[in-house]
């Protein structure tokens, strides 16, 4: 990765002080802007002009994008995203995360069992009198009120995040937009938006970014921002009470780097871009740690999702493998009856589809869905407190529908039949190679010249066709999908 020596934006009198510590995503940082005289260094990646925002030198990305395969810990997900506390979020997530600092001792010689330097966890510049220290293996860790603020809130009765759609919705001047791009978006560069007709398949990577803007003249406090890739199935049944619609959520993937967290790194480059201003779309990177959107403040963050090959094993309680495969998109996710464009929505015979003009709307295809629906979408949701009632509610939400056709023409579904065939083909290939080697050695021992035809003849798989059918599937009683492969004797 190379770094450009010319800043794309120049700014006046702005300087950033940051402190970061390594995390699962590469770094967690909090920062404090300071305006004053610039003490320029060539490596600072900051410059100044008449603007009021900060900018960084944009790193040049490699053309080949590699999605990190590092998964966050279950503990991190449980503490940050699995529950929605009904009390104040500030109790559990202070504005600045704790950071580690090496504290020196006054003693010149450390005592036995103690190290010369202590690692101390701090949440501010001063360790108050209420804080105390715990020594573990010669290392001291400061704890106190600040540590209790980031404790697990298992004892707090929270709302499971799966019930987020059941929360009451209120109208706020927060505008949320979602954009899907052809490649990984880059800071300071104009993105190339993906076509609405794009179909994704298993293993494909979805790139994009979102923007959140406060369009009012007053600061707005929010509690949490979630960015997910979700899949739902819906069906309609006739009952004595009318038509009932049943919806089940079959897939839920959370981008923890794009959702609100203390992390402000671009996952594509590993750069800490917190607070940097992008003149391309007039946005600042990252969501503020204070969770307060100032008037006119427009924020953005990048997201990345990888389409899975199958759902979780617990999707089918009977353990049928075929039931855990990712179903394809089916049907039309019709908007609510209050949508202004619903009355003018028409199916185009020439194009073969119909859709609303809104970005991210579902495609209406002639797929004979008969009221059934399988829909995949990227969802952005902002949760906060209603000022009037004090209850947790949805302050803003946005959905971007995507089409998924798993196991495209170049990818075959994983099945037991394919496993059997792969093993048999592998046996044939090994036998072919061994036969070729034996024939070559035999001719060498008899001093017979080796010709190209000898190798080609040994490579013919039809000579070894009796090898097929050497494996059989031992299915579990009552379940043909689960079992083991057994080699025939």
UniProtKB/Swiss-Prot annotation:
Organism: Saccharomyces cerevisiae (strain ATCC 204508 / S288c) (Baker's yeast)
Superkingdom assignment: Eukaryota
Keyword Glycoprotein tagged: no
Protein name as annotated: Bypass of stop codon protein 5
Residues in the signal sequence: none
UniProt cross-references to InterPro entries, sorted A to Z: Bul1-like, Bul1_N
Annotated segments matching region Disordered: 1-42
Function text: Appears to play a role in translation fidelity, and may act when translation is compromised. May be a component of the ubiquitination pathway.
Phenotype on disruption: Increases readthrough at premature stop codons and leads to an increased rate of translation.
Compositionally skewed regions (Low complexity) per UniProt: 18-30
Something else known: Open reading frame exhibits genomic organization compatible with a translational readthrough-dependent mode of expression.
Coiled coil (residue ranges): none
Gene Ontology cellular component list: ubiquitin ligase complex
Gene name linked to the record: BSC5
Family membership: Belongs to the BUL1 family.
């Amino acid at each position: 990765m190379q770094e450009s020596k010319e800043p794309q934006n120049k700014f006046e009198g702005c300087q950033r002080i940051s402190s970061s510590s390594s995390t699962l995503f590469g770094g967690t940082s909090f920062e404090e802007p300071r305006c004053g005289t610039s003490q320029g260094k060539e490596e600072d990646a900051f410059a100044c002009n008449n603007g009021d925002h900060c900018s960084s030198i944009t790193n040049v990305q490699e053309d080949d994008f590699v999605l990190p395969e590092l998964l966050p810990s279950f503990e991190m997900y449980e503490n940050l995203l699995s529950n929605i506390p009904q009390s104040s979020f500030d109790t559990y997530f202070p504005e600045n995360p704790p950071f580690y600092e090496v504290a020196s001792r006054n003693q010149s010689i450390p005592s036995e069992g103690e190290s010369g330097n202590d690692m101390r966890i701090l949440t501010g510049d001063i360790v108050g009198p209420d804080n105390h220290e715990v020594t573990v293996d010669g290392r001291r860790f400061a704890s106190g009120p600040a540590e209790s603020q980031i404790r697990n809130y298992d004892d707090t009765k929270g709302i499971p995040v799966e019930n987020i759609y059941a929360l009451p919705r209120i109208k706020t001047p927060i505008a949320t937009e979602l954009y899907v791009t052809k490649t990984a978006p880059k800071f300071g560069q104009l993105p190339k938006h993906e076509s609405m007709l794009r179909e994704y398949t298993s293993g494909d990577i979805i790139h994009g970014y979102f923007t959140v803007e406060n369009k009012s003249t007053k600061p707005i406090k929010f509690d949490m921002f979630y960015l997910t890739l979700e899949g739902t199935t819906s069906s309609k049944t006739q009952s004595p009470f009318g038509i009932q619609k049943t919806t089940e959520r079959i897939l839920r993937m959370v981008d923890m780097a794009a959702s609100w967290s203390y992390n402000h790194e671009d996952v594509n480059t590993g750069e800490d871009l917190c607070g940097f201003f992008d003149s391309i779309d007039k946005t600042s990177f990252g969501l503020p740690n204070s969770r307060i959107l100032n008037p006119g403040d427009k924020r953005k963050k990048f997201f990345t999702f990888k389409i899975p090959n199958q759902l979780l094993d617990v999707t089918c309680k009977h353990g049928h493998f075929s039931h855990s495969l990712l179903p394809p998109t089916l049907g039309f996710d019709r908007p609510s009856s209050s949508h202004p464009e619903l009355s003018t929505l028409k199916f185009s015979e020439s194009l073969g589809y119909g859709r609303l003009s809104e970005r991210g709307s579902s495609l209406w295809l002639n797929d004979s869905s008969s009221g059934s629906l399988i829909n995949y979408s990227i969802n952005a949701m902002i949760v906060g407190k209603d000022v009037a009632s004090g209850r947790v509610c949805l302050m803003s939400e946005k959905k971007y529908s995507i089409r998924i056709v798993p196991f495209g023409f170049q990818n075959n579904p994983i099945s037991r039949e394919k496993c059997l065939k792969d093993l048999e083909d592998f046996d044939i290939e090994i036998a072919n190679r061994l036969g070729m080697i034996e024939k070559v050695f035999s001719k060498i021992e008899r001093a017979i010249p080796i010709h190209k035809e000898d190798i080609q003849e040994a490579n013919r798989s039809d000579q070894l066709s009796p090898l097929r059918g050497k494996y059989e599937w031992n299915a579990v009683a009552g379940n043909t999908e689960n079992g083991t492969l057994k080699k025939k004797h």
